[in-house]
Amino acid sequence: MNHSTLEIFIQVAETQSVTQAAKRLGRAQSNITTRIQQLEEELAVELFVRGNKKMVLSPAGVQFLSYARRILSLAEEAKQALHPTTPGGSLRLGAMEATAASRLPPLLTRFQQQCPQVDITLITQPTRQLTEGVLTAALDAALVCLPPGADGQPACPAELAFTPVFYETLMLVRPQTPGPLRFAAFASGCSYRALGERWLAEQQAAVEVHEVNSYHSMLACVASGRYACLLPQSVLSLMTLPENCLSEPLCEATTQLIWRSGLSAPALSEWRKLL
């Protein structure tokens, strides 16, 4: 088992395809297939369930994927630790859609100017999925809105560290004409969605959620006169509010940066300083 074999395994797991993994890595398909077979022989388990032209992870493969990501992350951290004054390598960052749209553009520009040797990648997902990504080492860090725990403090998994970085005013956008409403929101796992559903449940008996993929789609739903949505003021200020809609502050929310406790990669340290 070596570094390149783990990279191959992760790519096949993420794409569920030997063909796509080969394209990403610039390798021959036969080489990808052989390396996966060798890895399975070494581990004495089947990592994939082969069928229907897809390479789907087996239960053992799902478990091993988390370890593979952590091994590569630790190897990268060790490499960077040898050159602590010159951040390099990669930084895999996750963020909520709102944060990526309204907060990150100038910060990413500044970070690349200060750390040109760092290869930074960004993905956008809801808070729950981002938290899982950091826990499994698929991400180095993520900007999320942690839900409150029983004590009112952010409910952060014990394996993670966090710090507050942004404070958002969440705006409720709804039609001017009163009446029963549905709620337009991102997929389950979004903290803002949970807050919006709670508000709507206080207003009416039934709560029906329509899932969308963008804030523009949310506003389009509200403009139809049958939906409400919740979005940060920082995002709403970048958009045009439909004429037949009104907006009002509903609550405050905090955006936190989360990362695995003990992770001390120079690139991550520089990103934390920037925030």
Regions inferred by a protein language model and the residue ranges of each:
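Acidic, Gly/Pro-rich loop/turn segments at junctions of secondary structure
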Residues: 125-181, 234-241
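Central regulatory/effector-binding core of bacterial HTH transcription factors
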Residues: 88-151
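Short helix-boundary/capping micro-motifs
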Residues: 10-28
